[in-house]
């Protein structure tokens, strides 16, 4: 699939390789939050492993060199429900959101802490509590981004029960 602009906003489309026929998989209308008249301006997106959900990255902000902070939304394909993640967290503060292997959760970083959000209920669980000025969880500092091209510092376990992550204490650095 690919992201294309239309008169009404961003659309996600697929092309049949043999015929070149274009099919809109997700319309701009489906990407319009309830009560709004404009669709989300998508910077990036990823499908869940079973293609039943779409994770959309929007409203992005730069951290060091790249737009890695922003807002994330999930579109459930079965019922067309569009839900913003991270309710109660600061606008454009989420980073590196990713589906759990079974697609029932999304984990992300906000203000140097890692969170997990259950998609069926919207319940958000803060997994790390010590993130702040000198403690970084689930992402990297400037040196890692600049010298090693590392930005995203956490991964789901294959069974989706755990998250492995980088933890840095930059005090005195």
Region locations from a protein language model:
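Beta-propeller folds
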Residues: 1-173
């Amino acid at each position: 699939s690919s992201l294309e602009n239309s008169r009404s906003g961003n659309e996600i489309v697929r092309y049949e390789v043999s015929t070149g026929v274009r099919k809109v998989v997700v319309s701009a209308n489906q990407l319009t939050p309830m009560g709004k008249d404009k669709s989300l301006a998508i910077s990036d997106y990823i499908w869940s492993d079973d293609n039943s959900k779409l994770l959309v990255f929007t409203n992005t902000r730069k951290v060091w060199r790249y737009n890695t902070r922003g807002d994330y939304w999930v579109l459930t394909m079965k019922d067309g429900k569009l839900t913003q993640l991270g309710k109660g967290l600061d606008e454009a503060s989420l980073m590196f959101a990713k589906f759990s292997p079974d697609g029932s959760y999304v984990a992300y970083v906000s203000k140097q802490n890692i969170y997990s959000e259950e998609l069926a209920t919207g319940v958000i669980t803060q997994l790390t509590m010590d993130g702040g000025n000198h403690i970084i969880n689930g992402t990297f500092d400037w040196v890692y981004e600049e010298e090693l091209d590392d930005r995203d510092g956490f991964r789901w376990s294959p069974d989706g029960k755990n998250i492995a992550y980088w933890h840095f204490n930059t005090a005195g650095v």
